């Protein structure tokens, strides 16, 4: 896993690690910040949107057409 500013690279990780690391990263960024998440775990197609809905973050865009899934989320409240 690598983090480059507002990119969270979760490739090669499997559930539950992606959500745990996403939660940690969300705590570290400021409200209004957009985060790009990269993953190759099929469970994240379901898990990340559910996480955003539950935690009230904006899921701005999803791209699951390639083998690397991309999610753009915006932190919308303080954790």
Curated annotation (Swiss-Prot):
CDD domains cross-referenced by the UniProt entry: SirA (cd03423)
Taxon lineage: Bacteria, Pseudomonadati, Pseudomonadota, Gammaproteobacteria, Enterobacterales
A Gene Ontology term for the protein's cellular component: cytoplasm
Record's protein name: Sulfur carrier protein TusA
GO-annotated biological processes: tRNA wobble position uridine thiolation
Assembly: Interacts with IscS.
Active-site residues from the entry: 15 (cysteine persulfide intermediate)
InterPro entries cross-referenced by the UniProt entry: Sulphur_carrier_TusA, TusA-like, TusA-like_sf
Localisation: Cytoplasm
Family under the similarity heading: Belongs to the sulfur carrier protein TusA family.
Pfam families the record matches: TusA (PF01206)
Function text: Sulfur carrier protein involved in sulfur trafficking in the cell. Part of a sulfur-relay system required for 2-thiolation during synthesis of 2-thiouridine of the modified wobble base 5-methylaminomethyl-2-thiouridine (mnm(5)s(2)U) in tRNA. Interacts with IscS and stimulates its cysteine desulfurase activity. Accepts an activated sulfur from IscS, which is then transferred to TusD, and thus determines the direction of sulfur flow from IscS to 2-thiouridine formation. Also appears to be involved in sulfur transfer for the biosynthesis of molybdopterin.
Pathway as given in its UniProt record: tRNA modification
Keywords, comma-separated and alphabetical: Cytoplasm, tRNA processing
MF (Gene Ontology): sulfur carrier activity
PANTHER family: SULFUR CARRIER PROTEIN TUSA, SULFUR CARRIER PROTEIN YEDF-RELATED
Species this chain originates from: Buchnera aphidicola subsp. Baizongia pistaciae (strain Bp)
Domain of life: Bacteria
């Amino acid at each position: 896993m690598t983090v480059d500013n507002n990119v969270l690279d979760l490739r090669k990780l499997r559930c539950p690690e992606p959500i745990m690391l996403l939660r940690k990263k969300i705590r570290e960024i400021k409200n209004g910040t957009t985060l790009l998440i990269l993953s190759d775990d099929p469970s994240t197609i379901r898990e990340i949107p559910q996480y955003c809905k539950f935690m009230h973050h904006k899921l701005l865009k999803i791209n699951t057409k390639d083998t690397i899934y991309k999610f753009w989320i915006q932190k919308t409240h303080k954790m």
